[in-house]
Amino acid sequence: ETTGLPFASQNDGVMHACGHDSHIAILLGAAAILQSIKDQLHGTVKLVFQPSEEEALFPGAQGIVDSGILDDVDEIYGLHVWPQLPVGTVGLKKGNLMAASDHFLVHIKGKSTHGAEPHNGVDAIVAAANWIVNIESMVARETNPMENLVCTIGVINGGDRYNVGCGDVHLEGTCRTYAPEKRDYIERRLGESLQALDMLLKTKSTLDYKRGHGATINNPDAIDYATSIVEKYLGKDAVVHPEFPSMAAEDFSAYLHKIKGAFLWLGTGFEGNPALHNEAFTIDEKILEPGITMMAAIAAEFLQEKSSLK
């Protein structure tokens, strides 16, 4: 962490680079408000503090859903700090908001040899380079440009010596999309492309493809309700309806697959602010108060409205 803040992380490689500490602070603030007016609440509010949100393969949200604690919940709302939106605004988008996120690991095994005698080996680095180009070609040429699909190789490891043809390469990456059928498609095509690679270049490859978060899809009526709350408590100028969704992922999707609701983006953007997951990421703490107000009001007014309909 390079923020220089007095509460900066003291552990190398570990920091709050995605704003989840501010999410907890906001929810605790909302809890304090709701507790102070609990006698006026016409129902129960359950608060979820994002356990294991950053772990895509073992998301905490799915564990919460599986526990059954949300079985009697009528609607659910959440937020995430969002540097792409200005401080003082809230992003409210109907439908697709954030993508599904899958994780894959690939091992391409060749045969090492002296760098002067490549014909006596099977170069796993050349094979890996070939495969990466094939992936990009599949995404660019087999996918409708209007259908969102992103595949990124984030890790590639292979080779030990400059003059030795590499015998093993390990790759790791992610695929993002909004459509379940696209997840099926890309998993199948990654496997098929490795099989073709093995036939062409005499490698032996394996694919370990793991499904992560599903797509975060907001209920239109829930967004309309949240918009009315933002307008009432933060002002109409605070409302932003983003034109495009994000290819980032969020385990709140597990809740929205089960319960009507919406996920909101709380603007934290200021001049020169770094992106999420950057070592210099921080927030403008001015966003905490409106975040608290919004979340408390969403819960309190929902219960009031639900009670009046009975």
Model-derived features: positions:
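A generic alpha-helix surface/boundary motif
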Residues: A25, F58-P59, E192, D224
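Metal-dependent amide/peptide-bond hydrolase catalytic core
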Residues: A129-K310
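Histidine/acidic-residue-rich, glycine-tolerant segments that coordinate divalent metal ions
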Residues: L5-M15, D21-S22, L28, L34, ...
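Cytochrome P450 core scaffold surrounding the K-helix E-X-X-R motif
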Residues: E1-T2
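Short acidic-aromatic active-site loops that bind/stabilize oxyanions
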Residues: H16-A17, E285
